[in-house]
Amino acid sequence: MDLKQQYILALDEGTSSCRTIVFDKDLNQVAIAQNEFNQFFPKSGWVEQDPLEIWSVQLATMQSAKNKAQIKSNNIAAVGITNQRETIVLWNKENGLPVYNAIVWQDQRTASLCDKLNQDTKIKEFVKKHTGLPINPYFSATKIAWILENVPLAQKMLKEDKLLAGTIDTWLIWKLTGGKMHVTDVSNASRTLLFDITTMTWSQELGDIFKVPLSILPKVMPSNAHFGDIVPSHWSTSATGMVPIRGVAGDQQAALFGQLCVEPAMVKNTYGTGCFMLMNIGNELKYSQHNLLTTVAWQLENQKPVYALEGSVFVAGAALKWLRDSLKVMYSAAESDFYAKLAQKEEQEVVFVPAFTGLGAPYWDASARGAIFGIEANTKREHLVKATLEAIAFQANDLIKAMASDLNSSIKKIKADGGACNSNYLMQFQADIANLEVIIPKNVETTTMGAAFLAGLAVNYWKDTKQLEKLTGIAKQFKSQMNQTVREKKSKRWNEAVKRTLKWASLD
């Protein structure tokens, strides 16, 4: 092992696990360590995590990855951090102890407060204009307000000026730097409902609306700023290296950067349990006419912020899981391509709308429910599997169309990542139905790579994104092979099917 050699470490703190990956100059993964942590569900719709457990698990993976790579802290050029967004921690700055569990992004306990605020059209429009977001329990502000109102210890610490608040990146940086730095980056700040994306600062008006004192919030920095140095003893008892934290971004924004969607109109879609699609819209703030979110993608030092439009599909890979676990149609999701190809032999127009929990963008109908259309006497399991894969692509296509319309131009290609990318049938159908090119990178760890890229570029470990483009490479490309008549016919059928599922749960 060359002791002069330098590496980049990326910490990836997800919703259910923490990972650390060590990258070298050629973007090889030298070592990886991952551990899960606990989720708590104290009441229906409540989701919590233990901030001290998150910290100890993340620290353990950081040490483990370094040891597996057989390197010293002196060999680490910089560290990047990416994290689950919106999840919030409040803690005592004197002893580093949280005053309550972390309230997770999925947590719905503040739904009634959000409903109440949304009844005031002026407030609703002000918040949308200044944050790019709707007032929703998903985002951080009402979670902080809930803790301040319901946890006596939080009120006591606030009165004594000992209280700090932050998203998970802020909590980890505070711990890593030995309590020296209380900071966040623009991408994480933009998910709190307290950060004004028109001025790129915390907003007193937003603080007043949500009853959150700005004094407890971290300093907001560009995504590749110097967020402080890691205390050497966090690596090992004998470590001496002062390793800088030089890249921070929320997970979806990190994936957009990791996919090198650095020019306007570049789109990435993560095909996971659901789909997260983000489009780079450049330095000009734009608001969606289709209820997509406007968010800060990132900001590099001495440059203007880059904004993004974000849309999500609630059920993507989860629909394949439903086929496997609830209907027992197949043993594993890996079989889906086999069945889809089998179904192509006898053409049946089965359409499945997997609206298990309503439909997200661009429909925004919480009372839509799932339905399967076009079933005949000879419909078999393979037709259902094929329809499920196609449903994932149809839903993503609805987002693509919404984004193209907001941008006023067509989208020529999307970069894909996530588990469901393994389905060649899905990726080909996506290219066909959206009439564009789908590109899958060689390294699908795009979220972690985004954090690594930000940190590495900040310390000149890599020269620029052009160099990174050469290093990332393309694993697969899918181009449209469907003629326009067939595409229109299939799209028309999908649109009709969706229409028939809307408002289902609200029927008397």
From Swiss-Prot:
BP terms from Gene Ontology: glycerol catabolic process; glycerol metabolic process; glycerol-3-phosphate metabolic process
Gene3D superfamilies, per database record: 3.30.420.40
Residues annotated as binding glycerol: 85-86, 138, 251-252
This protein's UniProt keywords: ATP-binding, Glycerol metabolism, Kinase, Nucleotide-binding, Transferase
Reaction equation(s) it catalyzes: glycerol + ATP = sn-glycerol 3-phosphate + ADP + H(+)
Metabolic or biological pathway: Polyol metabolism; glycerol degradation via glycerol kinase pathway; sn-glycerol 3-phosphate from glycerol: step 1/1
GO molecular function: ATP binding; glycerol kinase activity
InterPro entries with a match to the protein in the record: ATPase_NBD (IPR043129), Carb_kinase_FGGY (IPR000577), Carb_kinase_FGGY_CS (IPR018483), FGGY_C (IPR018485), FGGY_N (IPR018484), Glycerol_kin (IPR005999)
An example Gene Ontology CC term for this record: cytosol
Residues holding ADP: 15, 19, 273, 317, 419
Enzyme Commission number: 2.7.1.30
Signal sequence residues: none
Database matches in SUPFAM superfamilies: Actin-like ATPase domain
Description of how activity is regulated: Inhibited by fructose 1,6-bisphosphate (FBP).
Top-level EC class as recorded in UniProt: transferase
Positions of ATP binding: 15-17, 273, 317, 419
Residues reported to bind sn-glycerol 3-phosphate: 15, 85-86, 138, 251
One Pfam assignment: FGGY_N
Similarity remark: Belongs to the FGGY kinase family.
Biological function: Key enzyme in the regulation of glycerol uptake and metabolism. Catalyzes the phosphorylation of glycerol to yield sn-glycerol 3-phosphate.
PANTHER family given in the database record: GLYCEROL KINASE, SUGAR KINASE
Full protein name: Glycerol kinase
Organism: Mycoplasma pneumoniae (strain ATCC 29342 / M129 / Subtype 1)
Gene assigned in the entry: glpK
